[in-house]
Amino acid sequence: MRGGKEAARLAEVERSSCLPPVADTDDPHAGMVWVPGGTFLMGDTYYPEEKPLREVTVEGFWMDRTEVTNAEFAAFVEATGYVTVAERPVDTTTHPGLPDYMKKPGAVVFVMPNDVSGTGDISQWWQYVPGANWRHPGGPGTSIENREQFPVTAIAYEDAQAYAAWKGRALPGEAQWEWAARAADPDAPASRAQPQEANTWQGIFPIINEADDGFVGIAPVGCFKPNAIGLYDMIGNLWEWTADAYEDAPGSRVIKGGSWLCAPSYCLRYRPGARQPQEADLATTHLGFRTIVSGSVP
């Protein structure tokens, strides 16, 4: 499928949910998976920022089995009145020299082009859209109606932190996230192949999306098989925030997991060891999050 009408047509027939929502219960670990502790070689050798391989020990913890959904984030906003970064007035003192359209609240949105001149210029498919936010992830005229079980997007780091604090939880550190993505297996292979059980880009990025996995964009949570300890969508679908600062990019945090925009011809970060920086105050529509909490062995 190329950009434009064909992509929109396919999107209309996608599933709206794959897993039932987490039941309302007093169990503090409802909807979470226990990740046993262990020691492993963290990192990878594919891209420079993934090196060096280093031995890391992680204590056991609980982690959300899926990325936080629109429904879950909506419950947080309803309970607290929270306003996300993408909905607030833009602080032009922090970001001087912005063009006028970027001085309005909004988020960065993937817009599938019909053609591109190489893949070096990401502005060919990424656009800052005034009015885009978690309620309107594609901008004005879009909504999350009938998308309650899709992962919430257009979430800045501060927003993810606020939700986690409200739940009495935290964002995972990079080592915790990577260990969980490896299914707590120190011998998990560092595969370079495009994963079959993950929402990634099939075709020529960014102009042809064959959508062989049934999704031309983001999938509802839990549509693909979980990993060996029961965590869904750790690879693909959305990048995920971690609590760790990115060492060579001031004001940025480490994000992990790749997204539905990763393809063999572009990105190649659908691997547990992959990482990249993300500006903490930038809301985008290929990035979400999940939470963790310390606890005892179940």
Protein language model regions, located:
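Short Gly/aromatic-enriched secondary-structure transition segments
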Residues: 47, 52-54, 74-79, 89-90
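An anion-binding catalytic pocket shared by soluble metabolic enzymes
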Residues: 64
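N-terminal pre-domain segments of enzymes
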Residues: 2-26
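Acidic glycine-/aspartate-rich tracts in secreted/extracellular proteins
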Residues: 68, 244-247, 296-297
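Functional-site microenvironments in short loops/helix caps that host divalent-cation chemistry
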Residues: 8-14, 34-35, 41, 89-276, ...
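Short, structured beta-strand segments at or near domain termini in extracellular proteins/domains
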Residues: 285-298
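Short capping motifs at secondary-structure boundaries
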Residues: 61, 76-85, 167-168
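Short, conserved catalytic-motif segment at the N-terminal edge
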Residues: 40-59, 140-143
